[in-house]
Amino acid sequence: MKTILDFHDKKSKKQKISMITCYDYSFARIVADSDIDCILVGDSLAMVMLGHSTTLDVSASVMAHHTAAVVRGAGDKFVIADLPFMSYRKGLTANMTAVEKVMKAGAHAVKLEGAAGNLKLVRHLVDSGVPVMGHLGLTPQSVNQLGGFKVQGRDEKAQKKILEAALQLQDAGAFSVVLECVPSKLAKEITAALEIPTIGIGAGVDCDGQVLVLQDMLGMNQGFKPKFVKTYLDGFNTIKGALNQYHQEVSTEIFPSEKESYS
């Protein structure tokens, strides 16, 4: 996928969209050589790469730094960058400063969380030529307001609010919307109501696509496995095993051998 038109094309053809998070050049090169459709440089890097407990502790400069690294390795993959917490709550001038940083880093689009208070910005960005992906349901930047990482849209009132927000984002010009941790039935209803594609994470099978955190699906975060995550590799133990083997071979003088030495 190379443009936002490919997102709409996939939805119209009922072809699922695969999106994965990525935060660095080395992994981006692997993703570039895979069948994955698009990359999200998520503000989840605050937790995954920097060890913070939430996504709140990341700046636009940090997002731009990681976005640039990913873009250098991503080949022709479509790259979306998150706008970090509070970067789009300071008026249009400050908003555009954050957007400019990640777009100049090479992102093809930006993602922002929520709809209330953001619709004017979405319209402004779209009118300025910046593609925007929305994000509804569990919005990690609002974790304190939401009372933690919880499923959203359980009751009828909340479901109606999320559906209305999705329609508002579409009307404002968003090319896609992420639905995170919402009941499958609600995600199905929203997907059917929208002309733009939905990307689910913990939102059931009926979304137009799916996204996972790369390190989660590779099984690298031992002891952390939300219900919506499927692991495709025991990455933690595989990598640990390689490190232990390296240590053992160094300790016993198996490595380096003559093969890895110069004459």
Curated annotation (Swiss-Prot):
Q: Between which residues do disulfide bridges form?
A: none
Q: Entry cofactor note text?
A: Binds 1 Mg(2+) ion per subunit.
Please name the top-level EC class of this enzyme.
transferase
What CDD domains does the entry give?
KPHMT-like
Q: Which domain of life is it from?
A: Bacteria
Write out the residues that bind 3-methyl-2-oxobutanoate. Answer: 43-44, 82, 111
Q: Which InterPro entries does UniProt cross-reference here? A: Pantoate_hydroxy_MeTrfase (IPR003700), Pyrv/PenolPyrv_kinase-like_dom (IPR015813), Pyrv_kinase-like_dom_sf (IPR040442)
Pathway the protein takes part in? Cofactor biosynthesis; (R)-pantothenate biosynthesis; (R)-pantoate from 3-methyl-2-oxobutanoate: step 1/2
Q: What does this protein do?
A: Catalyzes the reversible reaction in which hydroxymethyl group from 5,10-methylenetetrahydrofolate is transferred onto alpha-ketoisovalerate to form ketopantoate.
Q: What is this protein called?
A: 3-methyl-2-oxobutanoate hydroxymethyltransferase
Gene responsible for this protein: panB
